[in-house]
Structures are given as structure tokens and as C-alpha cells.
Amino acid sequence: MDILISDLIQNNFLNEERFASAFVSGKFRIKRWGRIKIRQHLKQKNISDYSINMGLKEIDEEEYLQNLHDLLETKNRLITAKNKWDRLAKLQRYIQSKGYENELVREALDQLVN
């Protein structure tokens, strides 16, 4: 069994960096997760910090921010709220559950409201 695993690693079939890159790409583009949630899930799979960081570097910053804004706009149309503060709280909880950073969330919510 060890020989088989060693052979797979040598032939680049088992590659942590490639896995991290594919995982990041899929979760970001398909599920529209943020960096925090992606990092947490990769850590649960015991992927090294180096591989995680290399995978996360592949996310285009402009596309990342566009995803954040698109998610907020879509959710904003779908939720019902008693007042402005309730709406903002629901939007913030939703987008943070997707794994986006607090600072980016605050900036995006400010832009959405103003």
C-alpha cells in the first residue's frame, strides 16, 4: 500500500497543491464561497497552509468582489425585513456564512445602502 501511494505521489496523481487549487476554484466559482469558508474546509481536510495559500492566490480579486456584490444584491431582493437595520443584519449574517471577510462585507453593505 505504501509503495502504491509513493508511486502515485511521484507521478503527480496525488498532489496536495493541485487538490487545493481545484477545491478553491470549484467552491469559489460554483458555490460562491469566500476565502474564510474555503480555508476552513481545506484545513478540515488537513491540507497544508502553503497549499491553501497557493490555491487562494488563484482567486481574482475583481471577480471575488463581484461575487460578493452579486450575492448581496440577489439576497437583498429575496429577503423581507421589518426595517433597514433588520435587513442589514440578515444580509450580513448571510454573506458571512458564505465565508467573506468582515471588512469587505461592511464596505459592500455600505455601497448597497448608499
Where are these regions (language model features)?
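An alpha-helical, amphipathic repeat domain used for nucleic-acid recognition
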Residues: 1-114
